[in-house]
Each structure stands twice: as C-alpha cells, then as structure tokens.
C-alpha cells in the first residue's frame, strides 16, 4: 500500500472496523504513514495499535510488513485473519470498546487531554481519540 500523510488529515476513525476488527483501519493508516515517503504527523504505532496487535498475536514488525506489501485493506485483513482467532478478535473488540483513557484515571487523562474538562460525556478511549483528532486538525486550519 502507498505511504500516507497524516500531517494533513487524521487516520480513519477509532471505531472504524474492517472484517469485524475495531480500530484495524486506523492502524493500517498509521502503518502506511510510517512507510518511506509517508508522514505520521502526531500518530504513533504504540498505544491502541500495539494493544490490538498484542491481543491478536501479531508483532508490530509483521503488521508493518503486511501493510507494506498489501495492495488493499482486504489483503491486510486476509493476512490478519490467517494469524489470529475469532476469540482473539472478540477479546480485542470487547477490551477496546470498554477502555477508558489512562485506565480510568480521569486526572491522568486530563493531563494528556486538558480539553476533557469541557467534555465529561467522553468516557471511552475511542471517543476521546476521535475528539482529539477533531481538535488537533481544527486548530491547524
């Protein structure tokens, strides 16, 4: 897959799914941005992406290589499904769907995302990441 520039726009939304795997499209975008010629902007492969890979039993190196040689998202999905089980996917999806920022420590979350004080309705990490994307790119325009 071609490199991607995430300095100009965010990766796909945190709740986006591919093949029933939450966060996979976003992680693909981040891996593409780390390819030669790409620009990851503020995005890294640790964090949720690393948790996803760990829970699916895939190394970061293997994932980056799969994305590099894939022609499409479906190619990445085929490779992921060959390396993981439905149980691992279900465990990941349940974990990420319930995950709170900074393990539920609101004070620590406020240190990372000071604007959370204005948004007490955002309790889940996926929602916080989406709002953080929105705020980051709104501030750049």
Give the location of each predicted region:
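Generic alpha-helix signal with a bias toward terminal, lower-confidence helices
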Residues: 57, 65-70, 75, 92, ...
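Intrinsically disordered regions, especially transient/low-confidence alpha-helical propensity segments
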Residues: 89-92, 112
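Charged interaction scaffolds used for protein-protein
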Residues: 71-90, 97
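Short amphipathic alpha-helical segments that mediate assembly, nucleic-acid/protein binding
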Residues: 24, 60, 73, 77, ...
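Alpha-helical interaction segments
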Residues: 13, 53, 81-85, 126
């Amino acid at each position: 897959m071609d490199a991607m520039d995430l300095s100009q726009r965010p990766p796909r939304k945190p709740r986006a799914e591919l093949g029933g795997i939450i966060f996979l499209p976003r992680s693909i975008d981040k891996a593409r941005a780390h390819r030669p010629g790409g620009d990851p902007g503020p995005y890294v492969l640790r964090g949720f992406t690393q948790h996803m890979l760990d829970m699916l039993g895939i190394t970061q190196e293997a994932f980056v290589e799969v994305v590099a040689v894939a022609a499409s998202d479906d190619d990445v999905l085929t490779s992921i499904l060959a390396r993981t089980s439905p149980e691992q996917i279900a465990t990941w999806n349940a974990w990420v769907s319930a995950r709170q920022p900074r393990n539920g420590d609101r004070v620590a979350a406020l240190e990372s995302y000071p604007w959370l004080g204005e948004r007490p309705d955002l309790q889940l990490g996926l929602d916080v990441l989406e709002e953080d994307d929105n705020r980051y790119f709104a501030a750049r325009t």
